Amino acid sequence: MAKLILATFAVVFMALAATSLAGDPDMLQDVCVADYKSLKGPLRLNGFPCKRIENVTANDFFFDGLMKAGNTGNAVGSVVTAASVESLPGLNTMGVSMARIDYAPWGLNPPHTHPRATEIIFVVEGSLDVGFVTTANKLFTRTVCKGEVFVFPRGLVHFQKNNGNTPAFAIAALNSQLPGTQSIAAALFGAAPPLPSDTLARAFQVDGGMVEFIKSKFVPPKY
């Protein structure tokens, strides 16, 4: 009996562990096209409610937003165009998404994390200096050229920088329909309400005036 209980516990534990390692929960039907209209009501859940199957069309599984380069005319010189469940409703419950990342010459996709997904990028044009930092603060970095691939582990801080004087772009794949993106600088210096300046000053070991100067570069979101 003891062996049976132990074996049962082991099987249950392994099943739970496998589920916890998945990027998104497994789908329970062929398709579950996101019904954005339902979000205006009281219904809230981890994901999106399904559109009625009789209202689903092929267009729910189509997105042409990655065809053209995005506008990189901003302070960091990069822009991300996401093909996630928010723009491609047919991705709901599929556990995957894509993105196009465009870089101006010397443009930077600043240090950020994806809390819900691992990311793999394929460089289509140009050459990028990329890297990620582990929880032990070890940096893994290298140059990735046209036709090459690099992977960023889930939840770790990472970046990409165009190291050339011509535009570059890459295609990213992620194992979540909505991986989430948190820019480190914007999260710390552009939060709403703002983080206390004395907290940031002590964390970065600088004076309060420097913190206020950096905060002035970020526009807090409006809720």
UniProtKB/Swiss-Prot annotation:
SUPFAM superfamilies: RmlC-like cupins (SSF51182). Glycans are attached at residue 55. Disulfide bonds join 32-50. The keyword Secreted applies. One of its GO terms (biological process) is regulation of root development. GO terms for cellular component: apoplast; plasmodesma. Mn(2+) binds at residues 112, 114, 119, 158. Its main location: secreted. Pfam families: Cupin_1. GO terms for molecular function: manganese ion binding. It is found in: Secreted, Extracellular space, Apoplast. Residues 64-212 form the Cupin type-1 domain. PROSITE patterns: GERMIN. Belongs to the germin family. This is Germin-like protein 1-3.
